[in-house]
Regions:
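Short, locally clustered residues in the helix-turn-helix/winged-helix DNA-binding domain
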Residues: 5-8, 17-21
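Short, hydrophobic-biased segments on the C-terminal half of alpha helices
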Residues: 45-46
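Short, Lys/Arg-rich nucleic-acid/phosphate-binding segment
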Residues: 58-64
Length: 108
């Protein structure tokens, strides 16, 4: 699954937010934070792993999850690029609106 499809689900975004704040959490700790069934949360964790958004380390009988910092950095870079593109477009729209306002005032 691609990154954006993985991020489309609010439960998966919540898991990522928790991991970002806590650093590392066991699968059990993650399960305990949600009212959904363990299999449902396991599926969400699988999607996050497949999208390379989280890393998992097996310690004894536990699976410890953490955010993949490289993937988060790539998302941040992409989001900043998109913000710049939108800023340019909004600035152009502001200019058009200013011209239209002046026309209305002049001929109003």
């Amino acid at each position: 699954m691609d990154t954006f499809s993985a991020l489309a689900d609010p439960t998966r975004r919540n898991i990522l937010e928790m991991l970002s704040k806590k650093g590392q959490l066991s699968a059990t700790d993650i399960y305990d934070k949600f009212s959904a069934s363990h299999p449902a949360i396991s599926q969400h964790l699988k999607v996050l792993r497949e999208a390379n958004l989280v890393q998992v380390e097996k310690k004894a009988q536990q699976r410890i999850y953490q955010v993949n910092p490289e993937a988060m950095h790539k998302l941040e870079v992409w989001a900043k690029k998109m913000a710049q593109v939108l800023d340019v477009r909004f600035e152009a729209l502001d200019k058009v609106l200013e011209v239209e306002k002046r026309k209305i005032k002049k001929h109003g």
